[in-house]
């Protein structure tokens, strides 16, 4: 799957994880990738099982029931330099890069796996978090496919 520059947002700030997840979902909805109902399913998914993946990465995506709201596969990349906490005050899980995902069928599972492998190397995450342009992000993530 190709990364679209209009779905890459740099230097974002969020008060909490729900705002961050909603932002990712709204990008997908605005781009015609999902119905607006998918956004709430992304929030629900995180409540059921955290979308925080470790290494400063979160991968918000919808519940299985929300697959009906996916119009086409898409992925957002949202850089949050100050981070957003996906954990608790006592057990913070801070993400500096978010990948909002909508996939037709089981396509999102492969996308999540590829991103997880790429981001297992924290140096790759640091490069994404430090990227200055959308083109730089696209170039870094060209290794994911």
From Swiss-Prot:
Positions of the catalytic residues: 61 (tele-phosphohistidine intermediate)
Q: Which residues carry this modification: Phosphohistidine?
A: 61
What this chain does, per the record? The phosphoenolpyruvate-dependent sugar phosphotransferase system (sugar PTS), a major carbohydrate active transport system, catalyzes the phosphorylation of incoming sugar substrates concomitantly with their translocation across the cell membrane. The enzyme II CmtAB PTS system is involved in D-mannitol transport.
Taken from the UniProt entry, a GO cellular component term is: cytoplasm
Q: State the organism of origin.
A: Streptococcus mutans serotype c (strain ATCC 700610 / UA159)
Gene Ontology biological-process entries? phosphoenolpyruvate-dependent sugar phosphotransferase system
Keywords per UniProt: Cytoplasm, Kinase, Phosphoprotein, Phosphotransferase system, Sugar transport, Transferase, Transport
- In terms of one coarse class, where is the protein primarily found? cytoplasm
Q: Which residues form the PTS EIIA type-2 domain?
A: 1-144
GO MF term list: kinase activity; protein-phosphocysteine-sugar phosphotransferase activity
| TM region positions | none
* Domain-related comment: The PTS EIIA type-2 domain is phosphorylated by phospho-HPr on a histidyl residue. Then, it transfers the phosphoryl group to the PTS EIIB type-2 domain.
The answer on whether this UniProt entry bears the keyword Transferase reads: yes
Q: Name the SUPFAM superfamilies for this protein.
A: Phoshotransferase/anion transport protein
Q: Which InterPro entries match?
A: PTrfase/Anion_transptr, PTS_EIIA_type-2_dom, Sugar_PTS
Task: Write out the annotated subcellular location.
Answer: Cytoplasm
Q: What is this protein called?
A: Mannitol-specific phosphotransferase enzyme IIA component
Q: Does the keyword Phosphoprotein apply?
A: yes
Q: Which gene name belongs to this protein? A: mtlF
